[in-house]
């Protein structure tokens, strides 16, 4: 798609937004219902596209993309009317004889730039929030998941007037052309370097941005943890989508006292999940493309492999791999892995573990396995990270009742449920003041008799 076509799409959406058609709550609900029905109608197409692009099994496709997206859409449908209403606020003395309220209004013409690793979930969830809030939306899916992008385009073409939602497929040229346009809001999910680039381009028009990025999310296991449960849940979170998950446990920090037992249990759980030959398992996915395959494979140090380590270039598959005895300066600790490699480091004290995490860029997620409530509270309260779990992994992502997002190097802003609606809304504060009484002492000239009243009213 060329720059002229993209400019026309944006202009058409802006003209449509100015008709105020999207301000009607019933219209928003109808749009969400259309989205829900279209996703349901294309469940088989979505599953097939995910199998093509990423090798995802049907069950994983439903659990992590289709079902979760439908749940979020249903949540927006259920709450859009209440969230869209004006909400009364208390009035202070200075605004006596007034009605004080907040009113959420849509930003306008918005851009959602989606990633390839969960191409439906990470497009449909922000889309639902944007529609509930009353915006028009241009979606730019990743070129790395072409089958999924094609299905997304088909879903949106069937469900929406293009003046409300349009999908723009393509690669870098289309990204550049889109970022040349003036937007009222940009929502980006992807890598830190590209997120910085998007924010830089958005700053030229002072466009507000939400950045959902990533980072090296730590998983801490102390000596009190239920190791069998920890092993199962760590294996689930790490090997899901063959590690291509922004909130996957990136590395393991384990107390030296339980190191050997925990690694043995993770090996057992991994074999139970995928068998002795995971590269031949049809339910075990593949790396998205040859470029990423080469990058991930290059992070494997053969001398430190204690599980897996084998890669098959013809199918872009890499075994679930555990690296033990990893040092902080190793290559695998210098970047977000985004693949099925779990580096293991040890600690002697909780102070050491906390300092290790705090000395690095703020991660998107953190996981702490411990039966000690004081330890749980310590890491949750005092260690900086976006969100996380106690005695589990990644499940904080799977709810519409709490927001999800990063901080620092892992992003800014939140979405899911009410947070999605708020992310795509501007909240106006309104004072509606009566005219039958006008307090005189707020007006100049400020004579001496007014001083006492001014102090009373504004203190």
List each model region and its residues:
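Structural signal for hydrophobic packing residues in well-ordered secondary-structure cores
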Residues: 17, 21, 36-39, 43, ...
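Residue-level signal for inorganic ion chemistry
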Residues: 28, 73, 134, 165, ...
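Residues at or immediately preceding the N-termini of alpha-helices
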Residues: 6, 25, 43, 227, ...
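Conserved C-terminal structural/oligomerization subdomain of aldehyde/semialdehyde dehydrogenase
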Residues: 220, 271, 317-459
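Aromatic/hydrophobic pocket-lining residues that form π-stacking "cages" and hydrophobic walls in ligand
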Residues: 126, 152, 198, 266, ...
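ALDH superfamily catalytic-core signature
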Residues: 160, 193-327, 350, 390, ...
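N-terminal Rossmann-like NAD(P)+-binding subdomain of aldehyde/semialdehyde dehydrogenases
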Residues: 1-101
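Rossmann-like NAD(P) dinucleotide-binding subdomain of oxidoreductase/dehydrogenase enzymes
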Residues: 91-229, 347
């Amino acid at each position: 798609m060329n720059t002229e076509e993209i400019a026309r799409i944006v202009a058409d959406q802006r003209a449509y937004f100015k008709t105020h058609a999207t301000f009607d709550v019933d219209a928003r609900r109808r749009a969400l219902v259309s989205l829900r029905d279209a996703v349901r109608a294309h469940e088989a197409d979505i599953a097939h596209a995910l199998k093509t692009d990423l090798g995802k099994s049907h069950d994983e496709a439903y659990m992590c993309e289709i079902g979760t997206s439908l749940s979020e859409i249903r949540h927006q449908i259920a709450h859009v009317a209440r969230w869209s209403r004006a909400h009364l606020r208390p009035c202070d003395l200075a605004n006596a004889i007034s009605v004080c309220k907040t009113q959420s209004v849509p930003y306008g013409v918005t851009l959602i730039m989606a990633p390839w690793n969960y191409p439906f979930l990470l497009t449909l969830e922000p889309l639902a929030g944007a529609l509930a809030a009353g915006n028009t939306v241009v979606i730019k899916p990743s070129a790395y998941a072409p089958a999924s992008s094609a299905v997304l385009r088909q879903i949106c073409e069937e469900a929406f007037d293009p003046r409300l939602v349009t999908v723009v497929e393509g690669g870098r040229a289309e990204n550049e052309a889109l970022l040349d346009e003036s937007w009222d809001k940009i929502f980006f999910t992807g890598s830190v370097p590209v997120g910085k680039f998007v924010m830089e381009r958005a700053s030229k028009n002072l466009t507000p941005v939400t950045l959902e990025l990533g980072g090296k999310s730590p998983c801490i296991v102390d000596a009190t943890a239920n190791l069998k449960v920890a092993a199962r849940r760590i294996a689930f979170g790490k090997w899901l989508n063959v590690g291509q998950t922004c909130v996957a446990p990136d590395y393991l920090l384990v107390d030296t006292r339980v190191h050997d037992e925990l690694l043995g249990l993770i090996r057992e759980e991994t074999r139970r999940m995928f068998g002795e030959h995971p590269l031949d398992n049809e339910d075990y996915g593949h790396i998205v493309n040859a470029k990423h395959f080469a990058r991930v494979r290059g992070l494997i140090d053969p001398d430190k492999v204690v599980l897996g380590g084998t890669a098959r270039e013809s199918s872009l598959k890499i075994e679930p791999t555990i690296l033990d005895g990893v040092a902080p300066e190793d290559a695998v600790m210098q970047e977000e892995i985004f693949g099925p490699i779990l580096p293991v480091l040890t600690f002697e004290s909780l102070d050491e573990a906390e300092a290790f995490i705090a000395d690095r860029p703020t991660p998107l997620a953190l996981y702490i396995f411990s039966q000690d409530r004081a330890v749980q509270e310590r890491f949750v309260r005092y260690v900086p990270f976006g969100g996380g779990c106690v005695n589990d992994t990644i499940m904080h992502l799977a709810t519409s009742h709490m927001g999800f997002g990063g901080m620092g190097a892992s992003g800014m802003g939140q979405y899911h449920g009410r947070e999605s609606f708020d992310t795509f809304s501007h909240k106006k504060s309104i004072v509606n003041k009566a005219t039958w009484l006008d307090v005189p002492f707020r007006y100049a000239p400020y004579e001496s008799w007014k001083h006492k009243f001014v102090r009373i009213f504004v203190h």
